[in-house]
């Protein structure tokens, strides 16, 4: 029992219980406890003598000091961090955005960081992860970004443009981080003349060094007008204009060399229109279509099914200007028409082959001779071959015009009406194109003039139609006469300002008339009232 009491006393002393009990006896006024103290003094004494209380206070102080020390250490470390151009731009991000806005582009901070620290570094063109890249590395990144096709990065254009602007026109906070400019390359010093060494004797004779002639690139062809620019020597400069020595024959020069020599000898002050140069034996030179010509014609013109008139006019100008051969015509049709369209064109062209009387013939041998479907043996250098090609090109144009005609549809012709601001001439041209496209009739045929005249009158704009219908002797007018009258009416149209002024004057006159009528009504009412008052 005594042992238990001693253990309890030891634990009580460890946690300050005995002190608490003593203080409690003092607080309640136990006898023999000495003078009484205030509650605050008693509480402080209890906390001071208790080991657990001191431990709690120590933990509270440590929990306050540790974050403070951590914050101070972090501030010290951050103050010693190396500043890089990307981080510098983030510190002045408002100025970077202003620079981008001045160029009409928009940049985002998050993507700016990703590009500068990751994507542009991974391009392997020398873009550093830290530090300022030189301008040549910036140019390499620009080449990758502006690359055509799927290899480019159009979404990164605003960012590299802004970076280029900061590098070429740097603000004050960027200049300290730019690499120093490269010193100018010194000019090479002129070499001082070396003293001439005395001639040395040699046991063997010195032979002049000669370069072996280069092998010709083109095969030898004496009849070819082309020259080998790698092996043929340039023509000599013109000397005196004296007559050539007798007995010597001037060798014939190539066409290009002679043209260059004539340009140097006789500089023309004015351009001259000269005929096409002929090759050897007065043979005309042949120039086939290039791939770029065919590509441009197909790219910049509508398909035949969409606008056959425009494509027919293009092919007509090509045939007249280039005078192509049979092979060239097939290449042209292959590039500009579909398989079904080519079939229709060739079929219509073979229908137009003239016979002996000048009218279309049905004889197969005559048709095959004039418009063959397989490659004929026509030599464009002979008059007979050129005549065959001329007839073939004419029939090809006739086939294009015949294939351009669609099934008769007069409803489509009636839908072509004159626009509000369209001139009569352009309206007539559209009307003729509709006749060619939707009817089998030729609008230029005098037998179809009456139909075209009626369509022109009734499909014109209302003001022109009303005045054309009131013309005297309308039956004797030709299409050109009606076009002149329509042009006069169109040119006498009032402008929008004149029409507005006319409507305003009409409204003003109407208001004045209404005002007068109201005045008369009021005067009548007043007079009647006065008469009633007098009678009463």
UniProtKB/Swiss-Prot annotation:
GO biological process: virion assembly
Biased composition annotated in UniProt, kind: Low complexity: 199-209
Residue intervals on the Cytoplasmic side: 1-54
Keyword Signal: no
Coiled coil residues, start to end: none
Record InterPro entries: G_retro_matrix, G_retro_matrix_sf, Gag_p12, Gag_P30, Retrov_capsid_N, Retroviral_Gag-Pol_poly, Retrovr_matrix
Extracellular membrane side: 76-536
Segments crossing the lipid bilayer: 55-75
PTM note: Glycosylated by host.
Keyword Hydrolase: no
Record field: compositional bias (Pro residues): 177-198, 210-223, 233-246
UniProt cross-references to PANTHER family, sorted A to Z: GAG_P30 DOMAIN-CONTAINING PROTEIN
Protein name listed in UniProt: Glyco-Gag protein
Organism ancestry: Viruses, Riboviria, Pararnavirae, Artverviricota, Revtraviricetes
